[in-house]
From Swiss-Prot:
GO terms for biological process: response to hydrogen peroxide. Its EC number is 1.7.99.1. Binds 1 [2Fe-2S] cluster. This is Hydroxylamine reductase. It comes from Aliivibrio fischeri (strain MJ11). One of its GO terms (cellular component) is cytoplasm.
Length: 553
């Protein structure tokens, strides 16, 4: 096992990356190795998908499946070795189907195909024991014995960034949004990474290409969500519980939440959101259901305690999943789509009957808590509608600065920085937030500036797109570059979605971003220095000193 893709990976003076019997996320060495094999097999699929475009051989089914399978290897998604093997064997079958069809078409059209990449040559046996034996060939750091560590680090930056983009591609696909050009670019990049590239400049360029592609993907996802559920609007959400049977929906998939709401109508079941599902309460086509009663719990790293105390059924629609056996709620947990845990019930399709039956069999909450309301729903339309008023307040000197404080949350005590930062931000500043990092401070009171709330919840991690649109609108209004705005991004990262959002911001030319709590372990000191110089990226330090530097700029 060697895994170094998330923020909590092992980092000591002598070791970087998880390389023991189990990773810090809880996945076993077996699952980690199988995920590497799956990724390598997917690079082989992309090789033939890219070659296929030379001879007009395109399989929509494979285009849509490949990013979904890649998503299964993201941090805290799938821990089930049998499911990962199924994905890998399906990749092998699709690769063979593509190769046969493409070679036949190339013969007919007399088209010259590229030389096979190492990933394209990679073949899987059918037996699990034989598959796992191939792990050394597929290791994400393959070649590290002879290649410079900077090359390995940049390969991983591109791989993990592309993995985050693939996750957003799958979220968009579920909502009916696909793009043939995005599929083509995805396959081109994935196939190229399967050649084990060694040019530092080309790898840096590739990371920017991934960032720009993800900007388009986030636009697609924004379209899918708003076309399906309406535009988010500022809405009050109860973060306390009420009496009754209950279902908890976690992850990111609004489609699944809608299906659950439809199928629980009239059954006396209250539905709660958890984690990144919080923004669901602001979408008109979701909040219209009266039994969508509130948001339960906080960020993903607290789920083992919070899920154990939830007296109903729990549905995990995407990342982030933790070991459910710790809190002994595995018998009430259901996984969806790419998510998996050994022994936990998995639901294919849109029939949630087993979830409903489970919820009805549980005790449910016995009494009503005193409600506590928070406000969500400052999505793209709401932000753009507020832009003229915001501009006026800036011109009048009532708003001095904007901070975007958000990203992934996690266990490390250093993450209290983000709580302290928002608490100490000047009272004439406005704080935008998104993703689960918001749970560090979103129940605190920030007041308003002449009717404009000082804390604006933009939404899920992918709703960085909305924040970018506001920044671009403000830059246009003030006739300045986006980096000349009184705007500072203070981001927390944990996994690969955060990596690709950072690449997107870099690719769009956004500079001066503060990131933490620690630097990605796969980036060497040399690479960090390059990124810091090129994009003026800063590491978080002391809140007081950072604020002083920001406001003095």
């Amino acid at each position: 096992m060697f895994c170094i893709q998330c923020e909590q990976t092992i980092q000591t003076p002598t070791t970087k990356g998880c390389s023991f019997a189990q990773g810090m996320c809880g996945k076993t060495a077996e699952v980690s190795d199988l995920q590497d094999i799956l990724v390598y097999a997917l690079q082989g699929v992309s090789f033939w998908a890219e070659q296929g475009r030379k001879v007009n051989v395109i399989f929509d089914e494979i285009d849509q499946w490949a990013p979904k399978a890649f998503f299964a290897t993201l941090t805290n998604v799938n821990f089930d070795p049998e499911r990962v093997i199924e994905f890998a064997l399906q990749a092998q079958a699709y690769k063979q189907q593509l190769e046969e069809t493409v070679r036949a078409a190339a013969t007919v059209t007399n088209t010259e195909l590229d030389e096979l990449s190492p990933a394209a040559k990679f073949e899987l046996p059918t037996e699990a024991e034989q598959i796992i034996a191939l792990a050394p060939q597929a290791a994400v750091n393959r070649g590290h014995e002879t290649q410079h560590e900077d090359i390995i680090g940049l390969r991983l930056l591109c791989l993990y960034g592309l993995k985050g983009a693939a996750a957003y591609m799958e979220h968009a696909r579920v909502l009916g949004q696909t793009d043939k050009d995005v599929f083509a670019e995805y396959h081109q990049i994935m196939a190229w990474l399967g050649t084990d590239p060694t040019d530092l400049g080309e790898l840096l360029d590739c990371s920017m290409k991934i960032g720009l592609m993800n900007y388009r993907i986030m636009e697609m996802l924004d379209t899918g969500e708003t076309d399906t559920f309406g535009h988010p609007e500022p809405s009050q959400v109860n973060v306390k519980t009420i009496e009754g049977k209950c279902i908890l929906v976690s992850g990111h998939d609004l489609h699944d939440l809608e299906k659950i709401l439809q199928q629980t109508e009239g059954k006396g079941i209250n539905v709660y959101t958890n984690g990144e599902m919080l923004p669901a309460h602001s979408y008109p086509e979701l909040k219209k259901y009266p039994h969508l009663v509130g948001n339960y719990g906080s960020a993903w790293q607290n789920q083992q305690k919070e899920f154990a105390n939830f007296p109903g059924a729990i549905v995990m629609t995407s990342n982030c999943l933790l070991n459910p056996n710790v809190g002994q709620y595995a018998d009430r947990l259901f996984t969806r789509s790419i998510v998996g845990w050994p022994g936990v019930a998995h639901i294919e399709g849109d029939d949630f009957t087993t979830v409903i039956d489970c919820a009805l069999a549980q005790e449910g909450f016995k009494h009503n808590e005193i409600e506590q309301m928070i406000t969500v729903g400052f999505g793209r339309n709401a932000l753009m509608a507020a832009a003229p008023a915001v501009v006026e307040q800036v011109k009048e000197g009532n708003i001095s600065h904007f901070f975007l404080v958000g990203g992934c949350d996690g266990d490390k005590s250093e993450r209290s920085y983000y709580t302290d930062f928002t608490a100490q931000a000047p009272e004439d500043s406005v704080i935008l937030t998104l993703a689960c990092g918001k749970y560090r401070f979103n129940k605190n009171q920030f007041g308003d500036i002449n009717g404009i709330p000082r804390l604006l919840d933009v939404g899920q991690c992918n709703d960085a797109y909305s924040a970018i649109q506001l920044a671009l609108a403000l830059a246009k209004e003030f006739d300045c570059d986006i980096n000349e705005l009184p705007l500072t991004l203070v981001l927390s990262w944990f996994e690969q979605k955060a990596i690709v959002i950072l690449l997107t911001l870099f690719a769009l030319g956004v500079k001066g971003i503060y990131t933490g709590p620690t630097a990605p372990a796969f980036l060497t000191d040399n690479l960090l220095a390059i990124i810091q110089e090129k994009f003026d990226m800063r590491s978080i330090g002391n809140v007081e000193d950072d604020l002083k530097a920001i406001l003095a700029a």
